[in-house]
């Protein structure tokens, strides 16, 4: 899973350079999670997970508070959680996760981003079966053996624990996100370089240099869309 970890790390580094866009996307996601349940993360698991993820991107407290207050205030802005699937150059596969208050606009924008950059939007299920929903954590200061022992003591059977570039990486089931993180926190691990819920490709493909350029242009076009929250793919970059 080393290459997959590198892809996630590079994607996060790229996002870190676009902080205002990242903050806006998290603001929307926090608002939706708070509005769909209780605005208190202690009683709203979905909100708690979003807030933990937001911490790894250093989302300012003011943005978090504003989104939660907006949800508390009974704002009538409603968003749909929609997934689009498609293909890029040479059969590469892409999943696009969105939060939208205008389904027609979002579908049109996503289709255009694919079509104008050598790709095409597929039907629901055409790509997702080649990805696994995964919780991933990365942090420093421990060894893989330390963490394996910790997880065993907590009776949490994660998918994999690796060591790379001074980081320990944990791959777990999505529903284990909270249990894994709480176990790590109880052991004094509170600084995560990555704490994410992602769609992880089961297999990665390698593209030609020319196709990589076109593929990256397509991914940039998708990620630039206001309604797009996450873009996942199976290309080794």
UniProtKB/Swiss-Prot annotation:
Pfam families: TACO1_YebC_N (PF20772), Transcrip_reg (PF01709). GO terms for biological process: regulation of DNA-templated transcription. SUPFAM superfamilies: YebC-like. It is found in: Cytoplasm. GO terms for molecular function: DNA binding. Keywords: Cytoplasm, DNA-binding, Transcription, Transcription regulation. GO terms for cellular component: cytosol. The keyword Cytoplasm applies. The keyword Endoplasmic reticulum does not apply. It comes from the Bacteria. Belongs to the TACO1 family. YeeN subfamily. This is Probable transcriptional regulatory protein Exig_1693. It comes from Exiguobacterium sibiricum (strain DSM 17290 / CCUG 55495 / CIP 109462 / JCM 13490 / 255-15).
